[in-house]
A protein has these predicted regions:
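Short, charged recognition helix plus adjacent turn
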Residues: 1-2, 38, 64-80
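A short, Lys/Arg-rich alpha-helix, primarily the initiator
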Residues: 1-20
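Residues within the helices of the helix-turn-helix
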Residues: 12, 23, 53
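The alpha-helix within a helix-turn-helix
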Residues: 15, 26, 56
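Short coil turns linking two alpha-helices in DNA-binding domains
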Residues: 21, 32-33, 48, 62
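Recognition helix of helix-turn-helix/homeodomain-like DNA-binding domains
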Residues: 30-46
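Short, basic-rich loop-to-helix N-cap that marks the start of a DNA-contacting helix
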Residues: 43-57
Length: 80
């Protein structure tokens, strides 16, 4: 799994755990819904660290805690 896929899976997991939808995550985070849906789009390869931080802030989750999960263990190398 690449980092983009792991980030998307982690945000979807957090939304599910909190019972919120992606558009609600956007509102909580002060970003547009299109920003969140663009990040979730599998055809997009990039995810901004600034966006990740804003979404974590909206969830009141430290960014270090966001990345400290088994989903981020054993990621594929991004340089090809």
């Amino acid at each position: 799994m690449c980092i983009k896929e792991a980030v998307v899976k982690r945000f979807l997991q957090l939304c599910r755990e909190r019972g919120i939808r992606p558009n609600q995550l956007a509102t909580l985070s002060g970003v547009t819904p299109s920003t969140v849906y663009s990040m979730l789009d599998p055809s997009r390869r990039d995810v901004s660290v600034v966006t990740i931080k804003k979404l974590c802030d909206g969830l009141e989750l430290p960014i270090s805690e966001f990345f400290s999960g088994p989903i981020f263990d054993g990621l594929e190398q991004e340089i090809r």
